[in-house]
Amino acid sequence: MMKSEMFRISSEPEATSAEVAVVREGLYRFNFDATGLTRHYDVNLFVRDRAGKIRGGLLGYVWAEWLHITELWLSDECRRQGLGARLLQKAERVASLVGARGAFLNTFDFQAPAFYARHGYEVYATLPDYPPGRAEHHLRKVFEMRGDSWHLHGRG
């Protein structure tokens, strides 16, 4: 029997968060071992109403000196009030304080590429026809180096 025959591949759309975490943690350990970069800092920012209900937020993490913004969402009543800009600025500030030299993210053409451009993000790659008839943009923003640390342009 070949070694690969000792294993099976299964499709599990209803996988538990614990099962998903096994794969994620395995990849993190592999990346940490391969690079020697073990510092990982989660960035979880929330917009809450007076009752404490979450109305939006920004999720991401800092690893390898970069902030990866994985999600930024605001409910309809929170849009066009500057909250998205405040979330982005807060995430960048937190990231720069823990040593990030830049930030990157993905956004669809029907989401917020113009918003990110207004905040200094530049497109470095585009995946056309994803979803069909649309495009996914990959953006980044490099922070400014001052002395021996990274800072946001025009800030502290």
Functional labels for PLM-detected ranges:
Residues 23, 116, 121:
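Conserved active-site tyrosine of GNAT-family acetyltransferases
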Residues 104-106, 122-140:
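Conserved catalytic-core motifs of GNAT/GCN5-like acyltransferases
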Residues 62-70, 79, 131-136:
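A conserved beta-turn-beta hairpin within the catalytic core of GNAT-like acetyltransferases
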Residues 80-93, 118:
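Conserved acetyl-CoA-binding loop-helix of GNAT-fold acetyltransferases
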Residues 95-108:
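Conserved GNAT acetyl-CoA-binding A-motif
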